[in-house]
């Protein structure tokens, strides 16, 4: 672990999900592997507010093998696959409050050669500018499901304070009724790595 990248304490995650989605912007997501570390600053997130949010996997208190981790305490990893992509979420809420924040995009920081190799043939801007892209670039897999984010090999460290945060509707949730209009997607204004 790079001593400059001290993992954020568990207390950091103990805040309302919308607030956490905003607070994660500018933080550094780090994944250590045998090949070396790779990291990026979080520049885009989406909040999912559990049982009352039709876009959340836990809508209506659906408790399945896949969503079980969402019912734990905040500050652990919820990974799932969509098509051929693994996506990473930060579990929020508290025990039995199944909420999460999807990490949608990163600005590459460390391990650029590793990211280039893992995202072979892609332009640097396309390494991490989407939720399925960033997990490939950092080698985040389903094996990371349930990991605490408070220490290696996968953790979040303090980064920088964004100057300007924008919000709007979440992406790719067209079948979720009124929930598709909730302004629970957050991004750093002007950052070229934001997905759209």
UniProtKB/Swiss-Prot annotation:
Keyword NAD (UniProt): no
NCBIfam families (UniProt xref): 3mg, PRK00802.1-2
EC number: 3.2.2.-
A Gene Ontology BP annotation from the UniProt entry: base-excision repair
Superkingdom of source: Bacteria
Record-stated family: Belongs to the DNA glycosylase MPG family.
The organism of origin for this protein: Bacillus licheniformis (strain ATCC 14580 / DSM 13 / JCM 2505 / CCUG 7422 / NBRC 12200 / NCIMB 9375 / NCTC 10341 / NRRL NRS-1264 / Gibson 46)
Sorted UniProt keywords: DNA damage, DNA repair, Hydrolase
Enzyme class: hydrolase
Phylogenetic lineage: Bacteria, Bacillati, Bacillota, Bacilli, Bacillales
Record protein name field: Putative 3-methyladenine DNA glycosylase
InterPro entries: Formyl_transferase-like_C_sf, MPG, MPG_sf
Listed CDD domains: AAG (cd00540)
GO molecular function terms attached to this record: alkylbase DNA N-glycosylase activity; DNA binding
HAMAP family in the record: 3MGH
The keyword Chaperone appears for this protein: no
Pfam families reported in the protein's UniProt record: Pur_DNA_glyco
Gene3D superfamilies xrefs: Methylpurine-DNA glycosylase (MPG) (3.10.300.10)
